[in-house]
Swiss-Prot record:
Name assigned to this protein: Putative F-box protein At1g32020
Pfam families (alphabetical): F-box
Domain named F-box: residues: 3-49
Record InterPro entries: F-box-like_dom_sf, F-box_AtFBL13-like, F-box_dom, FBL60-like
Length: 171
């Protein structure tokens, strides 16, 4: 006779186990039982590509929105989102980045190949983060002045310190 040992584990440990699954499989665990319904939302980070939920990225945006809304008090270890071409442009992309920084994200990796119309380049909170260890941004943006800019930034560990110490805006 088989024994169900996973059901006896505490929620935080079950969430840790689920965090090793891909996002699609993590979400699938929500139908296992009432206890598992929100486990995928309790993982310490989000790693999502819009190709996980084709065809147009709307489902991907819904997953990110649900995760951000459910975990308002959670400290995030990582936030990785990738919206490729052919997806519906989201106006919440930069808001998600700011929210992740607010939650003490350590590893931020955000890519959006769809142009985003913005007033400012990046949320100012990103420059003041005390927890950010690695930063990778690849975002196409339209500034209000109607100039098109494509940005790709990759900073890790000491590079962030060097980058921020050499820029007066960050001091």
């Amino acid at each position: 006779m088989e024994c169900d040992r996973i059901s006896t584990l505490p929620d935080h440990l079950v969430a840790k186990i689920v965090s090793y699954l891909g996002i699609k499989d993590s979400i699938k665990t929500s139908v296992l039982s009432k206890r598992w319904e929100f486990v995928w939302l309790k993982v310490v980070g989000l790693d999502l590509k819009n190709c996980d939920f084709p065809p147009n990225g709307i489902a991907s945006q819904m997953v990110v929105n649900k995760y951000m809304e459910f975990n308002s008090g959670l400290h995030m270890q990582y936030f990785k989102v990738n919206f490729g071409g052919n997806t519906v442009c989201t106006n919440r992309f930069l808001e998600w980045i700011a929210t992740a920084v607010d939650r003490g994200v350590q590893h931020l990796d955000a890519e959006n190949k769809n142009p985003v119309i913005i007033k400012e380049f990046m949320p100012k909170k990103i420059y003041k983060s005390k927890t950010l260890v690695s930063l990778k941004l690849a975002i196409k943006i339209f500034l209000k002045a109607r100039h098109f800019i494509s940005v790709f930034i990759v900073l890790q560990g000491q590079s962030i310190v060097q980058f921020s110490s050499r820029c007066g805006t960050f001091s």
